[in-house]
Design a protein with these regions (language model features):
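P-loop NTPase switch module centered on the Walker A-proximal segment
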Residues: 1-60, 66, 109, 115, ...
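P-loop NTPase catalytic nucleotide-binding module
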Residues: 61-184
């Protein structure tokens, strides 16, 4: 259960049934997150929320992949011309496969799908592809570390793909990328 799923029926079913607001402070800014239902049965809440948001986050399970609700949410967010991020959760659960879900997203939505963060191969943290660093879980916090050698080759391939995709966003970024092969 999450902070937003407080209704007894939501707790019992372990799903979001109605949209709720969760304010978050980040970088000196207040961000109001609207937690909408993921199941297609509750699509009305998703459609109503589109009028109040500036971007969307579609959460996918590493075990289950792309659901009907996720596909519909993508269509609605795209039709509303809103930037969208896919977040793959439950990567640490049995039969969870982050990279299978990533491959499915790329197959369905094309090369515009590119990761910015991936799980470490040993399952103890995540790798930030933008800044080329890793964060290893240490109790309730994460320690910043170098990218593990076991992940370095794969990380380099994914970073290159990310930079190429980002470079295609504007003419200026494309020129910078072709000059330096980096976007930092």
């Amino acid at each position: 259960n999450t902070v937003c799923d407080y209704d007894p029926e939501e707790i019992k079913r372990q799903i979001t049934i109605s949209t709720s607001v969760a304010p978050i402070s980040f970088g000196g800014c207040k961000i109001n997150v609207l937690d909408c239902p993921g199941y297609f049965d509750f699509v009305g809440d998703v459609l109503a929320s589109l009028r109040a948001v500036e971007a969307g986050v579609i959460v996918l399970s590493a075990k289950d992949g792309i659901s009907v609700g996720a596909e519909r949410s993508w269509k609605y967010l795209k039709a509303a011309n809103l930037p969208t991020v896919f977040c793959v959760s439950k990567c640490d659960e049995e039969h969870g496969d982050y990279f299978a879900v990533l491959d499915a997203l790329k197959a369905k939505y094309g090369s515009i799908v590119c990761p910015v963060t991936i799980p470490m191969s040993d399952g103890t943290g995540v790798i930030d592809l933008v800044h080329n660093v890793a964060y290893k879980q240490n109790g309730a916090k994460a320690d910043k570390i170098d990218v593990p050698a076991a992940d370095a080759g794969h990380v380099e391939e994914l970073r290159e793909a990310l930079m190429e995709t980002a470079a295609g966003a504007t003419e200026e970024l494309m020129e910078k990328f072709f000059e330096t092969m980096e976007l930092e």
